């Protein structure tokens, strides 16, 4: 199932070497980790909602997420310090490549009116962040068993030094970009 890992080792490394003429094999950019974050604003009023988000994120990532807590109190949002407000999971190694493969091949084609990602989503240091508006694009989520549609933020952290290197790397994994 780790076709993307083999794709990276066999084809993407060679194309990166040709494009950017790296002298050392450790200079070649690679994906370090993928962080999936799900903010659950409704958890302020109902603490049971966070459990549903945890279950969804566990099914999507194949790994148990950690609950994120509020750092400080904000009265206008009725938010107190250390209140549960979301969950996140960090994927590395084989699970990371497995998730990326499912994202590109299965989930992104199921997103409504999806044209591709903007190049503006890079942060200047080679990392790429985007959001999905609904968790039901993943086949692991059963539409009948969810309580509400939730979005998520996905950050792909790379070892690339520039956005151009990172764009070339992620394009090798068939991530669709427009511009």
From Swiss-Prot:
One of its GO terms (biological process) is translation. The keyword Phosphoprotein does not apply. The keyword Ribonucleoprotein applies. One of its GO terms (cellular component) is ribonucleoprotein complex. GO terms for molecular function: rRNA binding; structural constituent of ribosome; tRNA binding. InterPro entries: Ribosomal_uL5, Ribosomal_uL5_bac-type, Ribosomal_uL5_C, Ribosomal_uL5_CS, Ribosomal_uL5_dom_sf, Ribosomal_uL5_N. Keywords: Ribonucleoprotein, Ribosomal protein, RNA-binding, rRNA-binding, tRNA-binding. NCBIfam families: PRK00010.1. Belongs to the universal ribosomal protein uL5 family. This is one of the proteins that bind and probably mediate the attachment of the 5S RNA into the large ribosomal subunit, where it forms part of the central protuberance. In the 70S ribosome it contacts protein S13 of the 30S subunit (bridge B1b), connecting the 2 subunits; this bridge is implicated in subunit movement. Contacts the P site tRNA; the 5S rRNA and some of its associated proteins might help stabilize positioning of ribosome-bound tRNAs. Part of the 50S ribosomal subunit; part of the 5S rRNA/L5/L18/L25 subcomplex. Contacts the 5S rRNA and the P site tRNA. Forms a bridge to the 30S subunit in the 70S ribosome. HAMAP family: Ribosomal_uL5_B. This is Large ribosomal subunit protein uL5. It comes from Rickettsia prowazekii (strain Madrid E).
